[in-house]
């Protein structure tokens, strides 16, 4: 079905004699009269006419002129035509030699260098050239902006793009650094050495630890309950019983020292 539609469109766009509707008997007579080799050449020419253009596959253009799709090929063909015309004019002038001085002067006037003929540029080509120029100007503008930002210093930090800000090394600020900054701001302005900064940081951390200990000490503690009388008696009895079981020799020693019991 797709091939039928393609052939119908090809016949509509290219109204050649081969595609015209001719009576069947007449077509057979014409076919018999035309040699077989000529028919093969014509079919090959028709196939290659719309399929190949300077080695480029052109199927799917649906009969439109392929030169409009490639403006570079059009410009080259125009240049060739102009060069051929100029060569033909020069050859004609060389063949017709003037016979008198007046004719020579006329020919000299005619052979003066004329204005160069510029080839017509297609809109697609002009559009591509303008796009290239715009891209080049944008690229140059970005280069200039980046160089200005690099040379500007700290005044142009806010104008830099966000990607450049990510390269800055981030320093972690601790609680000791904050306490040290408070001490520096409250004290009189003087030069501090590295040892002074370390001492202030250690003092701030120890102060923080002592504050935490005080908070823990301030928590209310439950008083230990006093043991009851019954529990005290029970613990005393248990200690006695355990002492008898664990150390029976003590009891034997006591009994021997006291002597035999009398009834």
Curated annotation (Swiss-Prot):
Residues 243-263 are annotated as: Disordered. PANTHER family: NAD-DEPENDENT PROTEIN DEACETYLASE HST1-LIKE PROTEIN, PROTEIN TILLER ANGLE CONTROL 1. InterPro entries: TAC1 (IPR044989). Keywords: Growth regulation. One of its GO terms (biological process) is morphogenesis of a branching structure. This is Protein TILLER ANGLE CONTROL 1. The lineage of its organism: Eukaryota, Viridiplantae, Streptophyta, Embryophyta, Tracheophyta. Highly expressed in leaf sheath pulvinus. Expressed in shoot apical meristem and leaves. Coiled coil: none annotated. A motif (IGT motif) lies at residues 55-61. Belongs to the TAC family. Involved in the regulation of leaf growth angle. Promotes horizontal shoot growth.
């Amino acid at each position: 079905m797709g091939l039928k539609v393609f052939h119908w469109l090809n016949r509509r766009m290219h109204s050649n004699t081969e595609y015209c509707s001719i009576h069947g008997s007449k077509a057979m007579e014409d076919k018999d009269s035309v040699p077989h080799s000529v028919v093969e050449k014509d079919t090959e020419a028709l196939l290659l006419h719309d399929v190949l253009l300077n080695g480029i596959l052109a199927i799917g253009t649906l009969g439109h002129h392929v030169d409009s799709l490639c403006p570079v090929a059009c410009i080259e063909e125009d240049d060739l035509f102009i060069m051929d015309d100029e060569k033909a004019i020069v050859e004609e002038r060389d063949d017709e030699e003037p016979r008198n001085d007046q004719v020579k002067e006329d020919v000299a006037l005619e052979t003066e260098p004329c204005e160069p003929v510029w080839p017509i540029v297609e809109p697609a080509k002009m559009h591509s050239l303008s796009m290239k120029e715009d891209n080049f100007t944008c690229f140059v503008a970005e280069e200039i902006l980046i160089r200005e930002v690099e040379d500007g210093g700290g005044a142009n930090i806010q104008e830099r793009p966000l990607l450049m800000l990510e390269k800055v090394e981030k320093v972690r600020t601790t609680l000791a650094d904050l306490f040290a900054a408070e001490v520096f701001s409250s004290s009189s302005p003087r030069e501090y050495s590295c040892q002074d900064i370390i001492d202030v940081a250690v003092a701030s951390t120890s102060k923080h630890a002592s504050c935490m200990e005080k908070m823990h000490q301030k928590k209310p503690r439950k008083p230990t309950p006093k043991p009851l009388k019954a529990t005290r008696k029970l613990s005393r009895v248990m200690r006695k019983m355990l002492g008898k079981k664990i150390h029976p020799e003590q009891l034997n020693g006591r009994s021997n020292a006291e002597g035999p019991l009398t009834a």
